[in-house]
Amino acid sequence: MKTFSAKPQEVERKWYVIDAADKVLGRVAVEAANILRGKNKTIFTPHVDCGDFVIIVNADKVVLTGNKENAKIYTRFSGYVGGKQVDTPRKIRARRPELLLELAVKGMVPHTRLGRQQMTKLKVYAGASHPHEAQQPTAITL
């Protein structure tokens, strides 16, 4: 029996919605990353984008355990001398709450062209509403 390898044109994409209200950040991110990669499907192939679309709502209500809200550090670098910028989740949540979940999921997908392609299927919204009702997404409970 030969090993099955999915072809990109054979992959059928579905839409899923995850409500992140009062859920732990990492638990939501793991579930989203697995669906984006297609690891929940029987046709999973590591080098093919066989994942589905994921909508995460209520990103502003996601929970961090312990003292991570103040102690965890996100760093970025502009490329210029002295261009290192450090943020805590509290600052990021005040400025753009969706970014916390986007960064968490981004760290869980491959850091390649395939991972960037998979990240385009992630839609994160701070509030409870989203503009993708026409796709009839399936709700996922954690």
UniProtKB/Swiss-Prot annotation:
InterPro entries: Ribosomal_uL13, Ribosomal_uL13_bac-type, Ribosomal_uL13_CS, Ribosomal_uL13_sf. CDD domains: Ribosomal_L13. PANTHER family: LARGE RIBOSOMAL SUBUNIT PROTEIN UL13M (PTHR11545:SF2), RIBOSOMAL PROTEIN L13 (PTHR11545). The keyword Ribonucleoprotein applies. This protein is one of the early assembly proteins of the 50S ribosomal subunit, although it is not seen to bind rRNA by itself. It is important during the early stages of 50S assembly. The lineage of its organism: Bacteria, Pseudomonadati, Verrucomicrobiota, Verrucomicrobiia, Verrucomicrobiales. It comes from the Bacteria. Gene3D superfamilies: Ribosomal protein L13. One of its GO terms (biological process) is translation. Keywords: Ribonucleoprotein, Ribosomal protein. PROSITE patterns: RIBOSOMAL_L13. GO terms for molecular function: mRNA binding; structural constituent of ribosome. This is Large ribosomal subunit protein uL13. Part of the 50S ribosomal subunit. GO terms for cellular component: cytosolic large ribosomal subunit. Belongs to the universal ribosomal protein uL13 family.
